[in-house]
Regions:
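Gly/Ala-rich beta-loop-alpha elbow adjacent to hydrolase catalytic centers
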Residues: 89-93, 97
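Short beta-strand/loop motif that positions the catalytic acidic residue
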Residues: 203, 209-211
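Conserved HGGG/HGGXW glycine-rich cap/lid loop of the alpha/beta-hydrolase fold
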Residues: 5-58
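Active-site loop/oxyanion-hole signature of alpha/beta-hydrolase fold enzymes
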Residues: 46-86, 254
Length: 272
């Protein structure tokens, strides 16, 4: 474990494993444990817990944004001595990785996008449930906000269509730092990676995009769209976490490991 100081925030960094270096970021509300559960053994993984996540502080700057989080991650890569690395992550982490690849092509040698939730625009419709939860916490607090949300049309719809998403949304009300973290939720749900379809089309690196069905926050269509937009992307559909969590993570790690192994001898992927 290491730390990085940014704008008054002490950010926690994990640097574990050996071999090909992959900067792999967690999703919104996640942290090191989530990244570790997703990533296969046999490679070097660097994960920065974004501001307000895990053991990382919130810092002084507002609003929270993908630009902020991506700049923090790049600073962590600098501190780790990585000139060139594979960038990846799940959900929010995928959007951070995509931004890094498009904005810093000289630094990113490969791309892994797991269950992406953003394409190119800010505040996509699939982020509406998270924005709704954030607003309820900020306006009503956790107890009353949870009660209101439980009776909402959004909760009813997700109960039938994407129960795993609903469980994650209720988890935001249970966080000990729920009130403070709600601002992170609100800001990130309203933001976007800040890149265009043209930026994605210009990428000239190996890329893996992974998606699954039964997920309203991370639509399979989002993964399809990104895979089609990136010239050298490989698309993989895995079993939904909502139906088989163990199988989901097993297939996820297998896909990532196969991608990294298949490109481990490619000169452009070897960190300099």
């Amino acid at each position: 474990m290491g730390t990085l100081l940014r704008d008054g925030a002490t950010l926690r960094i994990t640097d574990t494993g050996e071999g090909l270096a992959v900067v792999f970021q967690h999703g919104l509300g996640g942290g090191e444990a989530q990244a570790g559960q997703t990533f296969p053994a046999g490679f070097r993984r660097i994960t920065l817990e974004c501001r307000g996540h895990g053991d990382s502080g919130l810092g002084e700057r507002r609003p929270f944004s993908f630009e902020m989080f991506a700049d923090d991650v790049l600073a962590a890569a600098d501190q780790a001595g990585l000139d060139r690395f594979v960038a990846g992550g799940g959900s929010m982490g995928a959007a951070i990785a995509l931004r890094l690849a498009c904005r810093h092509p000289q630094r990113v040698a490969g791309l892994i996008l797991v269950r992406p939730a953003w394409i190119f625009t800010a505040a996509p419709g699939n982020m509406q449930p998270i924005a709704e939860v954030a607003e309820l916490i900020l306006e009503h607090g956790t107890d009353k906000g949870r009660t209101i949300f439980a009776r909402s049309e959004t909760a009813t719809r997700l109960y039938h269509q994407a129960p795993d998403n609903l469980s994650s949304l209720f988890g935001y009300f249970d966080r000990p730092d729920a009130k403070a973290f709600a601002q992170v939720l609100a800001n990130i749900a309203a933001d976007g990676p800040g890149i265009s379809e043209r930026d994605a089309a210009a990428l000239d690196i190996p890329a893996l995009v992974i998606g699954n069905e039964v997920d309203a926050v991370h639509p399979l269509s989002t993964a399809y769209t990104l895979a089609a937009a990136i010239p050298d992307a490989v698309f993989a559909e895995i079993r939904p976490k909502a139906r088989d969590s163990v199988g989901h993570f097993s297939e996820l790690r297998t896909q990532i490991a196969a991608f990294l192994q298949s490109h481990s001898k490619v000169r452009s992927l070897i960190p300099s």
